[in-house]
Amino acid sequence: MKNTKQAIALASAAALSVGMLAGCGGAASSAATASSESNSTATAEASTTAASDGTLVLAETGFESKFSPFFAASAADQDVIDLTQIALLGADRKGEMVLNGIEGETREYNGTDYTYHGPADCVVTENADGTVTYDIKLREDLKFSDGEPVTIDDVIFSMYVFLDPTYDGSVTMYSTPIVGLDEYRSSMTTLSKLIAEAGEDNTDNTNFTAEQQKAFWDAVNDGGVKFAQEIIDYCVENGAAADANDAAGAASAWNLGELPAGATAKDMFELIGANYDWNFSSMEAETAGSKLSDLIPEDVYAYSTTGVNVGDAVASVAGIVKTGDYSMTLTTTELSTTMIYQLQMPIAPLHYYGDESLYDYDNNSFGFVKGDLSGVRAKTSAPMGAGMFTFSKYSDGVVYLDANPSYYDGAPKVAHVNMKETQEADKITGVQAGTIDISDPSYSLEVADQIADINGAEGEDGPVITTRLKDYRGYGYIALSAKNVNVGGDPSSQASKDLRKAIMT
């Protein structure tokens, strides 16, 4: 902990701390130590050992304990992943991709030159037939934190996880036009989708058993109906539906789509399922209270991540080709503005997240059985990667990280990082008290005044707290409580709706 100035960031703690955590060679994807007085890039010899002591404490909000490079969902969990993993390609301070990471690229930002290094080079070639080829070459000195080398097999394994038909994490590489990807994914679907689309009265059990069908529809009729009814009840309470039987009105208000008059809660749940291809994890986004995973049996919930071959099986993606131990090509059917950004994907260790006995590139086996990511999903409590820091433990709301001496761009200057789950009310006072080094409170005029008061009326930058404001790409809205703003105590009446509309316009 520092005893003098602390820093408070109005952005993600990990994002602000990258430069502070980097070794002399720089940060994960923006490696530089720049002179503040000239446009020349300062150079320094990268250290191979971390600082002998020193702990940086970062305030975080809302750990979900899904510390996986494939399935992290919350911002706090993703911050842990960002510090323990390396991305195949990185970006500069303007968000532009760095394609020559091995030798590095020097780019100007706000009058200062910065040199960016990364794990790989990428050459993009637009071909005469309209296809686009990405030639990727890895550095040959990369190591995971356990000392194992990073090779192109780890990259290919990671890609196939992201492209698996049952993958339901936040990375959307499966939406890119990679040659052969549609055929690879469409040759398999999920068990939940098959049963749902067959219907409750189905008698053809070619792809699933009668017992599985019954278990699925029992879950829909019980937990699924309860899940949908909570949405309807919420809409009624807030004046967006007429009564507890108004599934059609609630579906419209919830932006689920149209249902006919007289539709039921079960109809609403089936509409939600269709909207999300019957992926129960994705359907959780529509909750009005309860988790769907708490309402339906665990084995049925797993149907949405269980792959079933339909038609002729396609074992590999034609556009992904290994060309060497440290090189590969990826080909798309057309120029895609998003493809290059998808290559910011983490390089996860095959030997840790996958099954090495199931990796045989020449025989279309990529570290797991297609359609079965259960082994990958099981590794969420302790991430492993080749990033700046190694995961030590998660205990009592704190993630403990240690400097990775094998980090390719030099060991971090800070020996330890503690990522501490912190309530919003404590994000400023924690910095003031010295229990937190870097925080990210929600900004407001009241917060600005509080910081200025702590700094002795010296403003947002003072002897106690240093503030850095970061642009936040988001949106805000103003909401009215239908329970409080209505006519005659009837939130759902047309007069009440007209009143709220008049106030907002």
Where are these regions (language model features)?
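Extracytoplasmic/periplasmic ligand-capture domains
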Residues: N3-T4, I136-D168, G224, T306-V308, ...
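Bacterial lipoprotein signal-peptidase II cleavage site
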Residues: L21-S35
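Gly/Pro-rich hinge or "lid" segments in bacterial periplasmic/extracellular proteins
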Residues: R93-E96, D277, S281-A318, G324-S327, ...
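Aromatic- and charge-enriched surface segment that lines or borders ligand/interaction sites
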Residues: D113, A120-L292, T329, G430, ...
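Bacterial Sec-dependent N-terminal signal peptides
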Residues: M1-A11
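Hydrophobic core
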Residues: L16-M20
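N-terminal lobe/hinge region of extracytoplasmic solute-binding protein
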Residues: A59-D129, M384
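Short, solvent-exposed loop/turn elements at domain surfaces
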Residues: E64-F71, G90, E96-L99, S145-D146, ...
